[in-house]
Amino acid sequence: MADLAAELDALDADTAAALRHWGFDRDRLLGWAERLLPGDGASNRVRGEVTPPLPEDIEALPERTSDEGRRLEQLGLEAIRRGELAVVVLAGGMATRMGGVVKALVEIRPGLTFLDARLAEREHWSAVADAPLPLVLMTSYATDDPIRETLGDTLDGRRVDAFTQGVSLRLTPDGHLFRTAENRPSLHATGHGDLPDSIRGAGTLGRLMDEDVRVVWIANLDNLGAAIDPLVLGKHLDGGAPLTVEVVEKVPGDRGGSPFRVDGRPVILESFRVPEDVDEDAVGVFNTNTFLVDAAQLRDLDMDWTWFRVEKSVEGRPAIQFERLIGELTSALRSSFLLVPRSGPDSRFIPAKDHAELDANRNAISARVAHYLTAAEQSRHGP
């Protein structure tokens, strides 16, 4: 890796300053290159005995109108009113899937962005709780400035806050810095698995806990189905596991994470981690990337993260980057897998990864957003 080290030492002053600003770790990249670069996709596959989850590993969310549902909903609502919940929205990444526009600022309908919808949701539940419910955004070097500029004074560091995930540099398959057509190094965000280290390193988690937050709700920016719901929160609190993972019934074409047992432990495995001789279709549910985690467990987390070698096509050429995934939390924290609705008015999975998916799900997303906005308006002005 001597050549790569020399290339890093020779970076121009502006690039080096930007990397320092965003927390680039030179030694970590050199370590990844030495350990992971010589591998291929097979190196990402998990080792050990991998089997489908047991029936008792996955529990369905109770009906809201059942006695149990009403009890759990009340339990969650009381926790919100005590100020014990904070929401962290994953708003980082590379801003590439929506034509170069930061997804938080993409309009769901004219005049209303994903960020607007999350703010309206926060406003509603703050009114219900009669106390500010914290909304925290995990941004990246590519999304942080536009989001902060848009939020302006709304980003007050208490009701609405933000911290950034990590950054690194892409490599060529033979271990040199990948350079763009303009001969610039190619930066990338290092995955949503950065969240635990980044939220702690920024001091954000400590501040939230000082304000009595007990549960951190983690959700993708672009899944507006993953809304605050006292029923889900109550189920998490009642279940006793430090980590709750929302899953939905799998449909053809789903690619991503699902629950498996690895050496007897229930965990989330991404598709690329599942051994080739294991039938993924034997697992009928799919991870929505929505998590509820006990704040104290997140604060005290001490785990050896698995970093993955990911091959991308950048400007039509192969590039290698290294990432970690938030689902790996299940390998360190005892986890409960909660089956939630995928369809209908109570759907908790309405993704919009790109323009095509946004267009396909626009009606469902608009209906959910209308509920947020109506609820927020009623909270401010009365029915």
PLM feature spans:
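Solvent-exposed, flexible loop/coil residues
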Residues: 102, 109-112, 173, 203, ...
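N-terminal glycine-rich phosphate-binding loop and ensuing alpha1 helix
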Residues: 1-161, 169, 178-188, 196, ...
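A conserved hydrophobic position in a structured secondary element of the catalytic/binding core
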Residues: 139, 191, 293
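Amphipathic coiled-coil/heptad-repeat helices and related helical stalk/stem segments
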Residues: 72-73, 201, 322
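Conserved beta-loop-beta/alpha segment of the NTase-like Rossmann-fold superfamily
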Residues: 154-255
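A general secondary-structure junction signal
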Residues: 139, 164-166, 339-341
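Aromatic-residue hotspot detector
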Residues: 148, 162-163, 345-349
